């Protein structure tokens, strides 16, 4: 019986996601054992600055990918939104399980909705994507950076001077806390989700055919296609955590993919947004990127990167 070593970050959410996925594999009743190996990533260690200042995309995966390449582990369960657009040679996304709620969750200290927040209220987020879109809707708000895992951020909301914070609904759902803490879900039209938000990425080595066969049982074709369109868009624009960039695709009638893509300025004063429909994920992603580039997306990205330096 083969033992599969599964790499995971040490956070409660990462371990919850990893153990959930292992349980799904065990339920298949195939001859495999599983062992979790906890790995500390750069993103877990550097907590005093925003993600965009310390390298953005890849902060939570590089050390895990190194362990995959050196065969210390066989596979890893990531949040898809943490995955860079391009993976190291020899690694691949072995499967994408069914996506859960991709929306952002708004959590306020006193139960006020986003619209009801007092003028000048302090909003906690460490995401340029969230801050740009929410400042576009409410320029009066003050954005204050907040880092740490879910529990830490919820504690900071209670104890510090934040009036509200934004977290991914998916993480709260996986922890079983969504009903307890969420004030409201932000509609995708108000705050377009991050590329891959709500989805998991199961990463493994390309040459591990045995494991790839096992993972195929857990792949969700709709999630795979929609996330692929989002990631092509992200790759074409070379966007990461350093840029206010968003992309969310859904499957519509007749097997068509509808992708809403967005690039913004850091302060939310400019938001470029396009919706593209098509059947081929790559073509949809490239078309969305192309349309935004024509509107000046590359210039916004350059400006955002300069502001981060």
Curated annotation (Swiss-Prot):
Modified residues (S-(dipyrrolylmethanemethyl)cysteine): 241
Needed cofactors: dipyrromethane
Top-level taxon of origin: Bacteria
Keyword terms: Porphyrin biosynthesis, Transferase
KW Transferase (keyword) present: yes
GO biological process, one term: protoporphyrinogen IX biosynthetic process
Pathway recorded for this protein: Porphyrin-containing compound metabolism; protoporphyrin-IX biosynthesis; coproporphyrinogen-III from 5-aminolevulinate: step 2/4
Function: Tetrapolymerization of the monopyrrole PBG into the hydroxymethylbilane pre-uroporphyrinogen in several discrete steps.
Protein name: Porphobilinogen deaminase
Name of the coding gene: hemC
